[in-house]
Amino acid sequence: MMGRGLAAGLVLCAALWLASLAAYQPPRASGPETPPEEFSASRAMDVLRDLIGDGRPHPIGSAAAAVLRARIVQHLARLGVEPQLQTGALVCSDWGRCGTPINIVARLPGTDSAADADSVLLAAHYDSVPAGPGASDDGASVAAVLEIVRALQARPPTRHPIVLLIDEGEEAGLLGARLFAARHPLARYVKAAVNLDARGTSGASLLFETGTDNAWLIGLYAHALTRALTNSVYYTAYQLTPHATDFSVFRAAGWQGFNFAYIGGVARYHTPLDDLAHADPRSVGQQGTQALAALRALAAAELIDHPPGAAAYFDVFGRMIVRLPLAALRPAAWLLWALAIGVSGLLVRRGVLRLPAVAAAGAVLLGAGVLACCGGETLVVVLRALRVLPLAGGNPFIAHPWTVELAFTALSGLMLALIAEIARHVCGFWELFAACALCAATLAALLALWLPAASYLPWVPGVCAVLILLVPLRGRGEPAWVRDGAALLVLASALTVALPLCIPLYLALGVPALPVLALTLVCSLPWLALPLMRAGRIGRAAFAAGTAMVLGVAVIAALRVPVYTAEAPERLGMRYELDATAGQAFWTIVPDSTRLPAVFREAMAFTGGPAPLAPWSPLPAYRAVAPRLALDPPVLRLLSNQRSQYGWSAQLRLESPRGAAELALLFSPESAVRRVRVGGEAWPVAVLAGGWSSIEFLNPPPDGVALSFEAVAPAFDVVVQDQDHFLPAQAGVLERLRPAATVPWQNGDVTTVSTRLRLDLAHEPMPPPYALTAQPGTNMRTAAAPMTAVAIQPSTMIGRLTVNGPITDLLDASRMMTTISGTATTPLITALQNSARIGLIGRYWIPSPASTPTAITP
């Protein structure tokens, strides 16, 4: 028989899992009948439909962004709020993206009427990525801010003034938030902030980030809300990732506060499916309700003289928040470790436990943890080989994640069966119990050193286990129900703190989270191995066979359902790339799964396997030859160069003659450029793959961008590239072939034009008296003269130079050098019958014995 203890344990696991699932579902959306002082999801959705009903993407600086901005200003005016626009300044992110955001700023007075009163900021961003309309990220938050303003005005003013910031450029690198925090007069009075964002289109709203000294903040939050979903592991894990929101800027400014987001429907994030049809009113309502309560609590609190200190914290099924001060939790974890050793040692001395058996049980638990890690990674490899999961580096989200989540849960069940079977031969019940308690206490002590905010995970069940270990000290035999009850009590405490992590784990990390899920369950469920060990041979066999069957069914189900669907699509980018230096053009497809859909290969001669998108981008890309379109390439003009203390300095001007939406300058690794100066300020460049670095300008002005930099090496390659967020008309055939289960994402489908040239800053720039501008295909003829002097302006593209004269003399590569801004480089001109194909990028000079250059006429 299975055994009552094991059956009760399985029922307990199922009940706690269902309770966690229910807690992490957003509540029913509130309707228009909601009292005026409360947040109404229905009213917020009406505002959202009015703001982005046209469904157009609105990236920073776009015409659509200007239209949306005007609508937001109109809504604020209807609410009696007088917004101001913060404009005009160039801002760059920490990863080399620059733009000129336009922020919407307003102030709601508080009862503290002093001009320098401490204020609370309420923030959201109104820009979207170029690929999608951003209904949830972050249009829903903008609508929520407007609904919160309406609800605030239904009550008397708050104690502290509230500053509204609806900023632009978050998607481009938190540009609007940086501009506000650095330059707006109201920023100096802000002491706390509430930020709203989304990394999906649905799901429960989570408090995933707070200010630094957050013990008082969590206390404030716990008292303000009746339903709270948060824990300090979210906060700790988020700090270890490269992701950032506007709240990252606010934290860096020293402001306290709360950062809310929902992450359900993450497969639609930053795609065209982030639209009104997929925006969940329940998520909007829950996030708005939480933000309103948190904002009112902050606006009534003491923002300066609050108690210091951070806390570890977690919610209990969304009904309450348990707070543990970190200053006390660290010594408490070490004390627990000492108590676990002491109680276990006392039990050994009294003969209740056998030390070798406890050590053997500990080895079994450690081995199961290692095996869970190895087994999880192996299962990922197998599922990738079966094409159930995308390859490493691809999109980590699939359409039916429940299949693989079930498989990894079953894998952890097999580890439990293994623990119980081996432990039955090497130890008894209390010896395995003591080993579990020692493992939990040791893990808590280690986490207290390295990740203290996560140390509560093993500490809570560890405390329960050490207290229960006092029971066998009486020296009497305990009935079976006492032993089973002891194991299930600790199991309940372990699952209560662990399941809130397991539920959103996949949504946060995708496929890489699956082995972590298995390990987390193995670390949380060893207490279930105790009644399993006592279940009898038939019970253990039935449990092992059942979990193996679940694993098999999950894998078969994963094989039978599609990896991607129209509702949870693969992210696939299409690009038209024109290399003006080489005179080549390509259709490029970048599938996030790293696999090229067959329909494209059938239509065009795409490369057989993926290759890196560029020397600075490892994204897997497939290319096919495309027609060369008459697109003006971006221009680099070298204004000055000289020796500097760092190495070599230069001043440049970048221009996009075709007025592209983005303009970038990339430096080869030997340059070692790490900062550029634009508008008198120094900004960091992005450090890319292969040692390349870049600076990128969004919506650059028509006359271009002037910048300066310092490089270590005097000579290095640079690439100037501009980009638009659409494909040329000739790409229609590719767009029609796009599979239904794929969508563009992030920047969307793009057209890029690039030129590559070599700069040598050790030479003086060449004066430009003999310069002309040539368009692609222009024929330029010279008078008959060998070794004619020629100068070509940087704005020219690849062209053809026809010379009337001894072509072999003029184009003898052994005697001819081209120069770019005065720099001697390898020859770029190759003789081709009676003409030469020249890379007309930069300023070229062909030395001539003639005293006067021959005139050149088109």
Predicted regions and their residues:
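C-terminal domain-closing interface element
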Residues: 188-207, 331-352
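Ser/Thr-rich, low-complexity intrinsically disordered segments
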Residues: 766-858
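Juxtamembrane/start-of-transmembrane alpha-helix segments at the extracytoplasmic/lumenal side
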Residues: 316-336, 399-403
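Hydrophobic membrane-insertion alpha-helices, especially the h-region
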Residues: 6-20, 544-557
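Extracytosolic and intramembrane catalytic regions of membrane-associated proteins
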Residues: 70-78, 82-94, 99-107, 117, ...
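Soluble extramembrane regions of membrane proteins in the secretory/endomembrane system
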Residues: 27-324, 666-669, 681, 686-712, ...
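Ser/Thr/Pro/Gly-rich low-complexity linker/stalk segments immediately outside membranes or between
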Residues: 23-39, 563-573
